[in-house]
C-alpha cells in the first residue's frame, strides 16, 4: 500500500515556475514594446475600465466561485490568481507571436492585455473540473497547454472562417468546458474510501462562492462586449447580457426550489445557474434585436442550468467516470452549445432578411467553427491530462485530494504536512 503522506513539490514547483518566469521576462525583453501611438484619452480610460472589469471577474469572481469546498477554499482562490497571472503573460506573448511577429516586435496595448485576460479566463473555467486533485506544478502545465491551444484555435478560425475577435473568442465557453472535462477524465476518478466528504461544500466557503458569483453577475456584460468594435453592437451586447442574467437569477432560485422535494434552494445550483444567461447569449449578444428575446434565452438557460446541475453530473460520473464536483464544466458545456445554436438561428434569420442566398454556406461555416473548437478542446485536454499524470509533477496522493493542508502552512493543525 502506498504512503498517504503528500508528495513534496519543493524541488519541482520553484524550479519549474521560476525558470518559466525568467524565460517569459527574457521574451518580453527581446520581443515586446509598448504602443507609442497617442490614443484618445477618453478612449484610453474606457478601454482600461473594461480591462479592469475583466480582471475583477477573473481574480475575484472565478477565484471565489470555485472556493466552496469544505477543505479546499484557500487553494482554490490562490491557485486561480496564480494561473491568471501566468496565463495573461503567456497569452500576450502568444497572441503577439501569432499575429504581429512577422512585422517585428510585439506591440503591447490595452486591447492586447484585455484579449490576454479573456484567454486566461478559459483556464479558470476549465480548472474547476480538476481543482483539488492537482498541485501548482501541474497547473502550470495546464495553463501553458490550454492558452496555447486556445490561441491557435482563435488564429485558425480567424484565418479560415474570417471571423472577428468577438466571434473567435466567444467559443471560449465550449472550449473551456470540454477541455476541463477531458482533463478530469484522465485523472484518477474516485476518492478513497473514508474521504468522500472532502469534495462537499460548507456554509462559509459557499458564501464566498456566492460572492464570486455576484461579481461575475455584475461584470458579465463587460465580458460579452469587451471585443466588439461597433458602439451599437457593444450597446446591444451590454443590454442583452444584462437582461439575460437578470432573468436567469430569478429562474435559478425558482428552479432550484422546484427541483427539491421540500422546496428548498440549493446553493450549488444557484452559484452557477445565476450566470447561465450570460453564457447563453455570449456568442449572439450583439445580434439579438429585442430585450424580450434575451430574457427568454435567460429563462431557458436558467432552467437548463438547474436541470443539468441536478441530473447530468451523476449520469456522467457513472458513464464517463468524470467527478460530480465540476458543475460549472457541465453547465458551460450545455449553455455554450445553446449559445452557438442561437447564434446560428439568428444568423440564418439575418441572412434571410437581407435577401442573401448563401444561408447554407453560413450555417456550414458556423458548424465548422463549433466542431473545430470542440475537437481541439478534447484533443488538447486529453494531452494535458496525460501530461499531468507524469510522476515528475509530484501529484498529490488521492487521500489528500481537496485538502488545503497539503499546500498551506497551518501551524495550529496536525503535523505531517
From Swiss-Prot:
Effect the entry attributes to changing residue 223 to V: Found in RhDVa(FK) and RhDVa(TT); may be associated with low RHD expression, resulting in a weak D phenotype
Subcellular location: Cell membrane
Result for mutant: residue 103 to C: In a breast cancer sample; somatic mutation
Tissues where the protein occurs: Restricted to tissues or cell lines expressing erythroid characters.
Gene name of the encoded protein: RHD
Effect noted on mutating residue 201 to R: May be associated with low RHD expression, resulting in a weak D phenotype
Cystines in this chain: none
Outcome following mutation: residue 339 to E: May be associated with low RHD expression, resulting in a weak D phenotype
Record's protein name: Blood group Rh(D) polypeptide
Effect of residue 282 to D: May be associated with low RHD expression, resulting in a weak D phenotype
Coiled-coil ranges from the UniProt annotation: none
Organism of this sequence: Homo sapiens (Human)
Keyword Nucleus: no
Substitution effect: residue 385 to A: May be associated with low RHD expression, resulting in a weak D phenotype
Domain of life: Eukaryota
UniProt xrefs under Gene3D superfamilies: Ammonium transporter AmtB like domains
Effect of residue 277 to E: May be associated with low RHD expression, resulting in a weak D phenotype
Family per record: Belongs to the ammonium transporter (TC 2.A.49) family. Rh subfamily.
Function: May be part of an oligomeric complex which is likely to have a transport or channel function in the erythrocyte membrane.
MF GO annotations: ammonium channel activity
Effect of residue 110 to P: In Tar antigen
GO CC entries: plasma membrane
PTM annotation: Palmitoylated.
